[in-house]
Structure formats: structure tokens, C-alpha cells
UniProtKB/Swiss-Prot annotation:
The keyword Signal applies. Keywords: Cell wall, Cell wall biogenesis/degradation, Glycoprotein, Secreted, Signal. Residues 1-21 form the signal peptide. Epidermal anther cells. InterPro entries: Scorpion_toxin-like_sf. It comes from the Eukaryota. It is found in: Secreted, Cell wall. GO terms for biological process: cell wall organization. Gene3D superfamilies: Knottin, scorpion toxin-like. The keyword Secreted applies. This is Anther-specific protein SF2. GO terms for cellular component: extracellular region. It comes from Helianthus annuus (Common sunflower). The lineage of its organism: Eukaryota, Viridiplantae, Streptophyta, Embryophyta, Tracheophyta.
Amino acid sequence: MANNSVSYLVLLLLVFVLAISESAPVQYCDRVTNLYHEKCDEKQCTEHCKTNEKAESGYCLVVEKQQLSICSFDCSKYKPSTPAPPPPPPKLFYSGSWLQAKVENVMLPGQKNMNCTQCPK
């Protein structure tokens, strides 16, 4: 009996480990902060990125003798912007009298309509 429960526990633990390993890893997007211009300190940079930039973390990077503060964001939280929908097709405007004549099946002066049964002759 104890052997069955140990086997069941090991199997359950194995399934749990496999389920966790299948989850997608978090991808981070990095961006240089424009507001932090002091000598780069890891703790200050991280604090600035978390409070002012709403980032997950921050770190310092030296590029061509210039110290940069880089903020790291969780890419999965920010969906890419969707393009704007195309503009609607242009509206066709008709003269009120022409449209009314078509609706009422009445001929306008100079208009020839062979299907008009109620038209004056």
C-alpha cells in the first residue's frame, strides 16, 4: 500500500515538473531611459526604472565610454499596436429630387424610362 502511494506521489511530482517546464519563458524588452542622466549605479538605475518607467528592472551599460541606464520590460504585458482600420469607402451623394423620383417611380422632365407604367405620356 505504501509502495503505491509513493509511486503515485512520484508520478504526480513528475507531471507537475513537466507542466512547469512547458510554460513559455518571459521575454524582456530593453529600452534606454532618457530621464536618468547621473553616473550609472545599478541600484539607482533599477529603482528609477521601477518607479518612473514602470519597468520590471534596470541595469547599467557602457557604450563607447558613455554610461547608459537600460530599463527592462516584460514584453508579454505590452501587445503590439494594431494598425488603424482602412478608411470607409466614399459616400455617394445624389440629388434629392433624383433620389425621390427613383423612390416614387416618377419621371423627371427630360428623363426617359421604359419600365414606368404610371408615367404621364
